UniProtKB/Swiss-Prot annotation:
Notes concerning its domains: The transmembrane domains are required and sufficient for its oligomerization.
Transmembrane segments: 159-179, 183-203, 214-234, 244-264, 288-308
Biased composition (Polar residues): 428-437
GO BP annotations, alphabetical order: erythrocyte enucleation; erythrocyte maturation; nuclear membrane organization
Signal peptide: 1-44
Record key words, sorted: Erythrocyte maturation, Glycoprotein, Membrane, Nucleus, Phosphoprotein, Signal, Transmembrane, Transmembrane helix
Mutagenesis or variant effect for S420 to A/E: Partial loss of phosphorylation and loss of interaction with RAN-GTP
Free-text description of this protein's post-translational modifications in UniProt: Phosphorylated. Phosphorylation may regulate its interaction with RAN-GTP.
Tissues where the protein occurs: In the ovary, expression is strongest in primordial follicle oocytes and rapidly declines as oocytes mature and move from the cortex (at protein level).
Record's protein name: Nuclear envelope integral membrane protein 1
Phosphoserine modified-residue sites: S366, S419, S420
Entry-listed glycosylation sites: N123
Amino acid sequence: MAGGIKVSVWSAVGPGPRCWGAGGGGGATWLLLVVAGCVVCGSADVNVVMLQESQVDMNSSQQFCYKNVLIPKWHDIWTRIQVRVNSSKLVRVTQVDNEEKLKELEQFSIWNFFSSFLKEKLNDTYVNVGLYSTKTCLKVEMIEKDTTYSVTVTRRFDPKLFLVFLLGLTLFFCGDLLSRSQIFYYSTGMSVGIVASLLIVIFMISKFMPKRSPIYVILVGGWSFSLYLIQLVFKNLQEIWRSYWHYLLSYILTVGFMSFAVCYKYGPLENERSINLLTWTLQLLGLGLMYSSIQIPHVAFALIVIALCTKNLEYPIHWLCSTYRRMCKASGKPVPPRLLTEEEYRIQGEVETQKALQELREFCNSPECSAWKTISRIQSPKRFADFVEGSFHLTPNEVSVHEQEYGLGSIFTQDEELSSEEEGSEYPTFTQNNFLT
């Protein structure tokens, strides 16, 4: 009897000749296949320990389940539920969804057999539980005897999630500034070179490989192995720094300098399209970090929508302000223009005259001016040539005539005429000349 199923094995071990294989070895093989199939089909009872938000100490392999009964609230957006397994020696931890999957782990199968060798063996590991996950189960297997371990369930505010959210918010709102910053360009290039140096080497090797070459299979395996090494290093970074800090520091300095040299050779981005692509990439990365750092999906979606609206809010606000100004100008009374005083009129006339004369000199000295055609149309070519060279544009005689007509003498004459006309009035009229002030 195996799992409630009767197995008949007489045909594999009974006497008499059999045609299942040479030397009767096929009968034993058939027996093993039947027994293995029955073991896979059979079901075993699983002893499961229900976890609470506390600590449990064990000294044997055991299965655990945690049932989340609390409904997440809006203030739990950065709350994380973790199951920590801390042991004195190496243990293997497997996470599944429910008890049925735990029963499948207890049954023999080829997949479970090979996957047991691929799973990491750690003495301190964390299992994250989603806030909306109703149940999470895990299996702790002891590798060595005399191993003790503790299983702790915690529900607390995670500052890492908050920092990731701030990083995503910064990338989204400052992506256009960061894409044009040289400091961001060099720091990002050095960081990528330090973290993914092995991936970059494999990528450079693939550039020299011929197309349709079998070596691409090895390169794909190299990519996967490199990603696995990066993940493994980050998980054990603290231990690596404690034991091999001098090698790690030498690696960071060497690869960082090489990455800086490569970035310096190519220089920051100058093409506007490339800058736009980098900006959009940073903004999408920021939105992804914001969504992944918030544990409640609908709150994360709402915050992303608010961020998108806020980012593009300047355009509708600018349009509304310009529309409001146009409406105010259309509905309001026209404001009469302010008239210039005599002093302002005189100053403006002098400034504009000098400006126009200078522009005329520049035009006459430019290749666009036809000198012979201009000279043929004027009465005094020498005077025109002196003016182009910087001489005054009026002769002394013209200045004298202008002063007699519009200068101080003409002003006194006008004042005398006005005084004689107003002698019979009761109150005399005084005329103020702004040219004298």
